[in-house]
């Protein structure tokens, strides 16, 4: 593997890095993709209506619709798996997972995905990238020969994400100040506040007002590897020159880095850029 000077086998500190899925590792909302696949109109309007009523925790709207909306009843396990295959992922998730697993300059990371989306959707989207036992999503029972969605077993939205992250932290024996959480929307507010209280690092993957105000850092990019920027700066103490070197060791160039209050990044394959020059 390239970059052995930065990614050694000997680790000094153990961290837990948890990421949301919808619009954090992907460009899509799982519920919207499911609606479009099944030809169901008005998904966003239904979600907005549930939000106005405060009927469910933020992020759990799809779960509610799957159980209580006539148009969504009868969705099968196979449908959820197919949705995952249609999700458009951000770039370099596999490389991000590899670098976190192998360690960064003496820091070792356990990488987990915690999402309010159905587990089958997230697992299908990330198959071969993130191990199934490192994905925590909403679980249902499935009924009958068609395996249609049945009862809700567990939802990881709102305070459910807090419980999931805390359970992971305790199981892995990670101190509160060595937790990193990455999220994009209102369903991440509670868990970000929880991580902040423990002096962990929170990273917003969108400029959603509430999240950007809570998160330690905000990074906007279509490449999942951009998460490493605040990790390397805040945890590793890297400056911009050293960060660029880390990316170059992996054959990547940070082509654009517009730093205001938000880090905007465009990451390109280094070999492709050099051949085009």
Predicted segments with their positions:
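Alpha-helical substrate-recognition element adjacent to the catalytic core
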Residues: 1-139, 222
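C-terminal cap/substrate-recognition subdomain and adjoining C-terminal extension
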Residues: 84-277
